[in-house]
Amino acid sequence: MAEKCSAVFMDRDGTINEEVSFLNRMEQLKLYPQSGEAIRLINAAGMKAVVVSNQSGIARGYFTEDFVRSVHDRINELLGAEGARIDGFYVCPHHPIHGQGIYKQDCDCRKPKPGMLLQAAREMNIDLARSYMVGDMLRDVQTGKNAGAKGILVKTGYGVNVIRTDMPAYIAGDILEAVQWILKDRKKE
């Protein structure tokens, strides 16, 4: 079996693109200016770039899974213009309280549970102990910890207002600073 690779798991909204409450129109999608460079660095380092995102708007009926896939296609199109790519997108469409139909469930994939990272690790041959989870909420950091990866908080999106700082391995101003720290941290291995 091939050697396992490491990955940078990233939250989507508020981490690589601007936070809007329930992105449900394509024109709302705006990548942060530093996202392309950050993800290009991940790609160049031979790490997998993986988005893991709670999308309870699906459960709530605000948009469809097909719409979310089209957003992810557009993200890779925008990143591709900058020489970068996301290797995998994993989405939790559920909500335990506000979900409708099959989407109303207490699942294993909704962050801070590690289900999306565990699934990606299986499907993409990722070594979670050598991987990182970057996000703008403490639940993103906790998701990384729950999967055995290092959690990094970015001070964009909801992260701007986070005061508690005892959980992350690092607190970065944005995704680019987070990736620069990751690349330095990997050299310690």
Task: Give the role of each language-model region.
Residues 16-17, 59, 140-141:
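Catalytic P-loop NTPase motifs of RecA-like helicase/translocase cores
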Residues 48-54, 87-92, 153-154:
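Short beta-strand segments at enzyme active-site cores
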Residues 2-50:
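Active-site neighborhood of HAD-like aspartate-dependent phosphohydrolases
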Residues 21-30, 64-66, 103-107:
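Short glycine-enriched, charge-decorated loop/helix-capping segments at active-site entrances
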Residues 10-12, 53, 135-136, 173:
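Active-site flanking residues adjacent to catalytic metal/cofactor-binding acidic residues
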Residues 55-68:
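A short secondary-structure junction motif
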Residues 2-4, 66-69, 73-88, 96-133, ...:
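Asp-based, Mg2+/Mn2+-dependent phosphohydrolase catalytic module
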